[in-house]
């Protein structure tokens, strides 16, 4: 990017991104720009403006110091993965799961992240698998098995969210689904999944799911209803599916917020986490941006830095 566009200044030790993320490329603390009313940054322009290069430079320069994930929203990989089970996956859910997987193995300051809130939502939409049996649902849920637990200190991982050791919780959840032997009845498999999920929640987990999924449209404060409605909306497709996908994105950001806001997170984590959405003009990117903008306009606050790029053919 030409120097007169400020490319280098944006990335320097005391530049825009250092203050947005709260850390310099060398790891020094920086005062945060903006408060809890965090904006979404969108870089627009025509070809040759090096917007994608800028996002890659942000990733390469900062990702070792703060958890920054780069996502190419125009990549066909998410659509390809979703096509294998279109009733239980979409490009958006595959992208969110990819972000969570990368952060669940992040090895920087504060360690990896757990995503029990996102996991709960992804698990319930797994009931839409084509086969429809409890065994097929369990196999789909197993794809997300690493998300609700941290990769370090497994015995302590999010133990206040689930009862017992979380790794065993996920395994027991799958065992319970298969043992039910419900045949090809997606509704019954979904009910069994919700039963198994809520049976394994610790008190804090119940409070958190009530707070998050109890706020889902039509849930009236009941997390089971919220999760069930989310699964139904996902199955309905079109605008209803977009609502479900947007809520799953909120759940992912809630997991990140919880990791920072907890007592241990306050002591150990630094800066702000970042999500870099290249080619945000694509359907996947537009959906993610619309979801976070809608949430923030409605008063939902989180500390996740969202930076996107959008190509304009007219320059």
Residue ranges, per PLM feature:
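Conserved Walker B catalytic segment
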Residues: 7-32, 38, 243-313
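Short, charged/polar micro-motifs that form catalytic or ligand-binding hotspots
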Residues: 44-48, 85-89, 93, 234-246, ...
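Conserved NTP-binding/hydrolysis module of P-loop NTPases
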Residues: 79-112, 222-225, 229, 249-260
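Coupling/switch/interface segments within P-loop NTPase motor domains and analogous charged loops
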Residues: 101-247
